[in-house]
């Protein structure tokens, strides 16, 4: 599977996610970066869909943490290259 890397980050509510493209699947996808012990992914057929799914994933993560009485972790970009 050929993958193309794009040097761009999405940002929302203190969370950051990468953007990747799969030409085989013809879909944009990514995951929230620098979030300890937590995996959040998202995808879309366009940049608008990708960004909306990213926002929805972050909102769902925060809501789940609140329901469980936990403080949501934030992305840490202090040493991100």
Enumerate the language-model features and the residues they cover.
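Short glycine-enriched loop/turn motifs at secondary-structure junctions
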Residues: 33-37
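Short beta-strand motif preference
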Residues: 28-31
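Short, charged, surface-exposed hinge/linker loops at domain edges
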Residues: 1-18, 25, 38, 48, ...
């Amino acid at each position: 599977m050929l993958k193309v890397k794009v040097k761009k980050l999405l940002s929302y509510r203190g969370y950051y996610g990468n953007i990747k493209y799969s030409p085989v699947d013809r879909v944009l996808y990514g995951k929230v970066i620098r979030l300890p012990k937590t995996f959040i992914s998202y995808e879309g057929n366009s940049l608008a869909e990708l960004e909306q799914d990213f926002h929805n994933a972050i909102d769902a993560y925060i809501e789940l943490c609140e329901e469980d009485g936990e403080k949501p972790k934030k992305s840490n970009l202090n040493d991100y290259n």
